[in-house]
């Protein structure tokens, strides 16, 4: 008598404990042209012409840029010359040309290096509590080399609350805010609610972030900011330019977290983006979403606080810190600083060597390709050629 085959029970894959990738939305042109035409009392052909004029214009806007930035909506852009709006690809081309000292990219892209470098100059950063670094062969007080080291660290009450993120990540992917360990259930409690399994979290770090994962103290927001959006840090994206050694603030916007989001990145559904007055830090308007989902907001959806009359706390101090940080990083003439207001003063969370113009263009309803900025770009291209000439001359002398 043959034994019946044992049925195979397939276990569905477990969702990651952290967001390891963001979803990308590609828009089908024909349906989108028809939708835009119907909503704006025009024809699909006219929408095609409008898009083509921007696609072949100075900003080289892609179709996804056209929809995501809502460039079909003249009301959103409030009379702005849309030919000054830079598309995502041209955005990257411009920043790479401006920040021509590519030998400095490593300092900026590695969060350990950037935090250490800025703090050495006395700038306010968030210290590193521990670092998962499996490639190391020698232990230290900060470096966690093995899974068991990481497990023991995460079970320590004295290191919490914690914020974790990849050492070389971007857009807050892989980040998490943890309130405390729960040893009785082998879990970790998240700030903002919910729990995750410790072993599942370790699995995700091992699988996705073998290059390094760091932990920092969780920084609470300034009380005025907390009253607006709760126990999470909403950072200002401040873009600085440095020309002839002199820094200036180019653009600024306030990223406001909402819903279940602990991270303030605007791509996360529900988060808000505020246009602010650079002189005063006062909110001028707030938008959520992008493309067809974009909508203006007058109150925070969680707290109900009205945005009218609200200013970014510690704005004057933030500007001072941003300009000083730009002086320190003068080798990179354009940096997007993420800075948050806390009860202890403004703190630099990250610096971005290829800042995404989407945030500031969409918040301000104003393109970046204006005459003053293009003059700056031209000056940096000349500086890049001079730098290359000097390097070749130095090599020739060897």
Predicted regions and their residues:
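Protein kinase-like catalytic core scaffold
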Residues: 162, 248, 347-349
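Intrinsically disordered, low-structural-confidence terminal and linker regions
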Residues: 1-36
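C-terminal active-site "lid" helix and adjoining low-complexity regulatory extension at the edge
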Residues: 294-323, 327-332, 341-398
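Short, flexible loop/turn elements at secondary-structure junctions
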Residues: 132, 166-168, 182, 217-219, ...
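Active-site nucleotide/adenylate-binding loops and adjacent lid/helix of ATP-dependent enzymes
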Residues: 111-236
């Amino acid at each position: 008598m043959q034994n019946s085959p044992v049925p195979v029970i397939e276990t569905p894959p477990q969702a990651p404990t952290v967001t390891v990738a963001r979803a990308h939305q590609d828009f089908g042109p024909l349906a989108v042209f028809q939708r835009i035409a119907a909503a704006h009392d025009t024809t699909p052909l006219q929408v095609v012409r409008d898009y083509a004029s921007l696609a072949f214009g100075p900003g080289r806007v892609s179709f996804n840029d056209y929809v995501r930035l809502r460039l079909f909506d003249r009301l959103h852009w409030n009379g702005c010359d849309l030919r000054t709006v830079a598309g995502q690809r041209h955005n990257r081309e411009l920043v790479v040309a401006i920040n021509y000292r590519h030998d400095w990219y490593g300092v900026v892209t590695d969060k350990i290096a950037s935090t250490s470098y800025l703090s050495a100059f006395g700038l306010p950063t968030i210290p590193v509590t521990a670092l998962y670094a499996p490639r190391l062969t020698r232990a230290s007080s900060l470096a966690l080399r093995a899974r068991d080291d990481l497990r023991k660290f995460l079970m320590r009450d004295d290191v919490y609350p914690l914020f974790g993120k990849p050492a070389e990540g971007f857009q807050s992917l892989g980040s998490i805010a943890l309130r405390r360990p729960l040893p009785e259930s082998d879990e970790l409690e998240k700030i903002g609610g919910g729990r995750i399994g410790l072993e599942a979290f370790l699995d995700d770090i091992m699988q996705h972030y073998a290059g390094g994962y760091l932990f920092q103290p969780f920084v609470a927001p300034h009380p005025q900011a907390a009253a607006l959006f709760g126990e999470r840090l909403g950072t200002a994206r401040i873009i600085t330019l440095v020309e002839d050694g002199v820094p200036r603030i180019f653009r600024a916007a306030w990223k406001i977290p909402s819903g279940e989001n602990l991270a303030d990145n605007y791509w996360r559904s529900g988060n808000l983006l505020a246009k602010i007055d650079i002189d005063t830090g006062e909110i001028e308007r707030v938008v959520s979403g992008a493309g067809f989902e974009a909508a203006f907001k007058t109150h925070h959806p969680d707290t109900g606080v009205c945005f009218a009359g609200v200013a970014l706390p510690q704005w004057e101090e933030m500007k001072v810190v941003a300009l000083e940080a730009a002086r320190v990083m003068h080798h990179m003439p354009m940096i997007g600083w993420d800075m948050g207001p806390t009860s202890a003063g403004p703190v630099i969370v990250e610096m971005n060597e290829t800042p995404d113009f989407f945030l500031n263009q969409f918040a301000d309803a104003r393109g970046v390709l204006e005459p003053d900025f293009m003059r700056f770009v031209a000056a940096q291209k000349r500086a890049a050629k001079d730098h290359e000439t000097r390097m070749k001359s130095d090599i020739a002398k060897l």
